[in-house]
């Protein structure tokens, strides 16, 4: 059974990392970033809930007979 030749693996792995690094650098360099990002003011609308419109009573549960 022949022995597996691993002498070129280091070269292949390093060249792969270098290629991936260059590809990602090129992709990032073509990305358009905003120069001065500003927050857009959001107007908070208050929603009226039914229990805020009128006063409601909270009743205790009925007592059970002993």
UniProtKB/Swiss-Prot annotation:
Function: Subunit 8, of the mitochondrial membrane ATP synthase complex (F(1)F(0) ATP synthase or Complex V) that produces ATP from ADP in the presence of a proton gradient across the membrane which is generated by electron transport complexes of the respiratory chain. ATP synthase complex consist of a soluble F(1) head domain - the catalytic core - and a membrane F(1) domain - the membrane proton channel. These two domains are linked by a central stalk rotating inside the F(1) region and a stationary peripheral stalk.
Keyword Glycoprotein part of the UniProt annotation: no
Subunit organization: Component of the ATP synthase complex composed at least of ATP5F1A/subunit alpha, ATP5F1B/subunit beta, ATP5MC1/subunit c (homooctomer), MT-ATP6/subunit a, MT-ATP8/subunit 8, ATP5ME/subunit e, ATP5MF/subunit f, ATP5MG/subunit g, ATP5MK/subunit k, ATP5MJ/subunit j, ATP5F1C/subunit gamma, ATP5F1D/subunit delta, ATP5F1E/subunit epsilon, ATP5PF/subunit F6, ATP5PB/subunit b, ATP5PD/subunit d, ATP5PO/subunit OSCP.
Organism: Bos indicus
Membrane topology classification: Single-pass membrane protein
N6-acetyllysine carried by residues: 54, 57
Name under which the protein is recorded: ATP synthase F(0) complex subunit 8
A cellular-component GO term for this protein: mitochondrial membrane
GO MF annotations, alphabetized: proton transmembrane transporter activity
Modified residues annotated as N6-succinyllysine in this record: 54
Listed GO biological process terms: proton motive force-driven ATP synthesis
InterPro entries named in the record: ATP8_mammal, ATP8_metazoa
Residue pairs linked by disulfide bridges in the UniProt entry: none
Domain of life: Eukaryota
Regions that span the bilayer: 8-24
Main location: mitochondrion
Subcellular location: Mitochondrion membrane
Keywords linked to the UniProt accession: Acetylation, ATP synthesis, CF(0), Hydrogen ion transport, Ion transport, Membrane, Mitochondrion, Transmembrane, Transmembrane helix, Transport
Family stated for the protein in its record: Belongs to the ATPase protein 8 family.
């Amino acid at each position: 059974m022949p022995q597996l030749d691993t002498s070129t693996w280091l070269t292949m792995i390093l060249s792969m990392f270098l290629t991936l690094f260059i590809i990602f650098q090129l992709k990032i360099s073509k990305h358009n970033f905003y120069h001065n990002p500003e927050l857009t003011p959001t107007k908070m609308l208050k929603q009226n809930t039914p229990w805020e419109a009128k006063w409601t009573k909270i009743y205790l549960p009925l007592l059970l007979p002993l």
